[in-house]
């Protein structure tokens, strides 16, 4: 199985998707039924994708909730691996 050594924060994928749809952050937040600050935190890498947000993204932007959660999981695992020596 191929894995990325340094996957991007999934918020960057969300941001790209929003831009491809030619939406503003405010408009996308309304479509997702979340606050603008919540979406802003996600796309700026300050928050992750929860299962609830994954469902919202799949219904609004596309793909599946599992896709969005896998992006988050891969990112989180890569971040932990960077600190593996300090963990053990």
Could you say what each language-model-derived stretch is?
Residues 19, 30, 59:
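Short polybasic/polar patches that bind polyanions
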Residues 2-6, 30, 81-82:
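Short linear interaction segments
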Residues 35, 46, 61, 72-75:
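The DNA-recognition helices of helix-turn-helix-type DNA-binding domains
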Residues 1-23, 70:
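A short, Lys/Arg-rich alpha-helix, primarily the initiator
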Residues 23-41:
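Short alpha-helical DNA-recognition segment
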Residues 10, 64-65:
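Hydrophobic side chains within well-formed alpha-helices
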Residues 46-59:
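Short, basic-rich loop-to-helix N-cap that marks the start of a DNA-contacting helix
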């Amino acid at each position: 199985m191929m894995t990325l050594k340094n996957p991007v924060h999934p918020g960057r994928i969300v941001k790209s998707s929003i831009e491809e749809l030619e939406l503003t952050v405010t408009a996308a937040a309304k479509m997702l039924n979340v606050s603008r600050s919540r979406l802003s935190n996600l796309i700026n890498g300050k928050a992750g994708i929860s299962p609830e947000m994954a469902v919202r993204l799949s219904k609004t932007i596309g793909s599946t909730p599992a896709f969005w959660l896998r992006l988050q999981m891969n990112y989180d695992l890569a971040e932990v691996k960077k600190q593996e020596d300090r963990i053990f």
